[in-house]
UniProtKB/Swiss-Prot annotation:
InterPro entries assigned: I2BP1/2_C3HC4-RING_sf (IPR044882), Interferon_reg_fac2-bd1_2_Znf (IPR022750)
Full protein name: Interferon regulatory factor 2-binding protein 2
Protein family: Belongs to the IRF2BP family.
One Pfam family of this chain: IRF-2BP1_2
Cross-link (Glycyl lysine isopeptide (Lys-Gly) (interchain with G-Cter in SUMO2)), chain numbering: 271, 285, 306, 308, 331
Compositional bias (Low complexity): 132-147, 254-268
Modified residues (Phosphoserine): 71, 169, 226, 250, 300, 343, 389, 406, 438, 440, 443
Zinc finger feature spans (RING-type): 489-536
Biased composition (Polar residues): 357-368, 426-437
Keyword Mitochondrion: no
GO process annotations (BP): immature B cell differentiation; negative regulation of transcription by RNA polymerase II
């Protein structure tokens, strides 16, 4: 019952000739040579719709948008005569088969969606029952292709959907019911029509039947990578047809004319395989073009030997493999690069480049493909820290990831270290990490203060105030600061929370808990200038002016002393 209602509702809809969408009768306009919807008329303009309809009709005729079985069915007018077939159509027209009388009639008639007759019969789901769910055999699928080689992806409909919704809709989710030979050649050559004419001409000259040329043309044009594996296997089974029809290849596909392709074929033949059975031959067009370009630009030998012998070298050289296990995978790359020296460089320069005397294995030294200039990489390496510390190793991004440092923290670190002496203006902005919510991440400005302090102070004697923890280099993030030594208040020596304390922007070892900070502010007088809670007037970085708390910071610190009375539950 529901299916009958759906079919009845679908039968009332009419497809627009221009936009090809199913419309209700009240949305259609019948004042022109073809039924068009109001949306197309409004978009094109009533004065131009007829011209657009004629243009669309010519395009549909030229590109063969309606293969067999897709034209409207029903009573055909007696006056509608089939158009004269060209020589190309005669060559490529298959012999009639049993059970395909309807298909022959559909092919013979004009490729119009709607005959210019008053009796337009609705197309129901039963019209497609002969071709719906069953996958056609190879020969029938090839015969249903139009003459000029352009294939329609959804030549089949699904019975569970309203039939009017199946009219030439470019919906990709219906492609699974289509044989792989009917998938549109998206990445194929741009001159499909020309190649089809070349096939017809070649068939006419050589005397071969037209149907013999059409499967070869289908196999010659490479399909995109999204086509199922059955299509790739089908191509691999037709190497002889590819070699027999060289005229079908477009200029973009002519690998055989290049010297690199002949070398590839010779190399494959030396391994005991036919040239047409090479791996590169069954790849999509974009992959083949890329491989050929790499082969032409790499002068160290045939590219296939590089791919087969040293996959790690090519992967790291051309793609800059930024692996998660940093040093492990890159050491293997360095070993292969050291084994094979294609250029007469001294032995010491073959390995990974050294920066600041340390080996950087994450920079590849492959000499083919993508070369890395060593001079720009100096901008990624920060100067060594001025303070000696057990944590003074400079971590480059892969190694820092092993140490638990996030890539964003590494980027911030590189930007800070490359900046030089720009911290003086930052130091006047925020002087403490006075956040009430300890679970929130530290603000960037406070992180900069805690990170910039030790680098800029450098040689200052920070032990004068009895600093209880060593000065950490700027390369370590806040998490490693907290993990290396417990944070203690400089005054009361109590354990500090990771993010909930007051940090002196000048002296890194000056860290104060909130009770000590409140007491210091009250002692100094909150109305005037309030300096470092240590009692010293710590100068700003790069100047002799002592820093002082801003009023907002004083209010934040003192706000923790106020206890809010809870309301009684009423």
């Amino acid at each position: 019952m529901a299916a009958a209602v759906a079919v009845a509702a679908a039968s009332r809809r009419q497809s627009c000739y221009l936009c090809d969408l199913p419309r209700m009768p009240w949305a259609m306009i019948w004042d022109f040579t073809e039924p068009v919807c109001r949306g197309c008329v409004n978009y094109e303009g009533a004065d131009r719709v007829e011209f657009v309809i004629e243009t669309a009709r010519q395009l549909k005729r030229a590109h063969g948008c309606f293969p067999e079985g897709r034209s409207p069915t029903g009573a055909q007018p007696a006056a509608a005569k089939p158009p004269p077939l060209s020589a190309k159509d005669l060559l490529l027209q298959p012999p009639p088969q049993l059970g395909h009388a309807g298909a022959e009639a559909a092919r013979a008639q004009a490729m119009e969606r709607y005959p210019l007759a008053p009796d337009r019969a609705p197309r129901l789901a039963s019209d497609f029952s002969t071709r719906a769910g069953a996958g056609l055999p190879q020969s029938a699928a090839q015969q249903s292709a139009p003459a000029n080689g352009i294939l329609v992806p959804n030549g089949f409909s699904k019975l569970e959907e309203p039939p009017e919704l199946n009219r030439q809709s470019p919906n990709p989710r219906r492609a699974h019911a289509v044989p792989p030979t009917l998938v549109p050649l998206v990445n194929g050559s741009a001159a499909l029509g020309l190649s089809g004419r070349a096939a017809a001409t070649l068939a006419a000259v050589s005397g071969t039947p037209g149907l013999g040329a059409q499967p070869a043309e289908l196999g010659t044009h490479k399909r995109p990578a999204s086509v199922s594996s059955a299509a790739a296997e089908h191509e691999a089974r037709e190497p002889s047809k590819e070699k027999a029809q060289p005229a079908h290849r477009s200029p973009a596909d002519s690998l055989s004319s290049a010297a690199g392709a002949s070398e590839l074929s010779a190399e494959g033949a030396g391994k005991g395989r036919a040239p047409g059975e090479q791996d590169w031959a069954s790849r999509p067009k974009t992959v083949r073009d890329t491989l050929l370009a790499l082969h032409q630009h790499g002068h160290s030998g045939p590219f296939e030997s590089k791919f087969k012998k040293e996959p790690a070298l090519t992967a790291a050289g051309r793609l800059l493999g930024f692996e998660a296990n940093g040093a492990n995978g890159s050491k293997a790359v360095a070993r292969t690069a050291r084994k094979r020296k294609p250029s007469p460089e001294p032995e010491g320069e073959v390995g990974p480049p050294k920066i600041n005397g340390e080996t950087q294995p994450w920079l590849s030294t492959s000499t083919e493909g993508l070369k890395i200039p060593i001079t720009p990489t100096s901008s990624f390496v920060s100067p060594p820290p001025p303070t000696a510390s057990p944590h003074s190793n400079r971590t480059t991004p892969p190694e820092a990831a092993q140490n638990g440092q996030s890539p964003m923290a590494a980027l911030i670190l590189v930007a800070d270290n490359a900046g030089g002496s720009h911290a003086s203006k930052d130091a006047t902005q925020v002087h403490s990490t006075t956040r009430r919510n300890s679970s929130s991440p530290p603000s960037p400005s406070s992180m900069n203060q805690r990170r910039l302090g030790p680098r800029e102070v450098g040689g200052q004697a920070t032990g004068s105030t009895g600093g209880l923890e060593p000065v950490h280099p700027a390369s370590l993030p806040d998490s490693s600061l907290a993990a290396s030594a417990p944070l203690c208040c400089t005054l009361c020596h109590e354990r500090l929370e990771d993010t909930h304390f007051v940090q002196c922007p000048s002296v890194p070892s000056h860290k104060f808990c909130f009770p000590c900070s409140r007491q210091s502010i009250k002692q100094q007088g909150a109305s005037g200038e309030v300096y470092c809670p240590s009692g010293e007037k710590c100068p700003l970085v790069g100047s002799n002016v002592p820093w002082a708390f801003m009023q907002g910071e004083i209010a934040t610190i003192l706000a923790g002393d106020v206890k809010v009375k809870k309301e009684r539950d009423s």
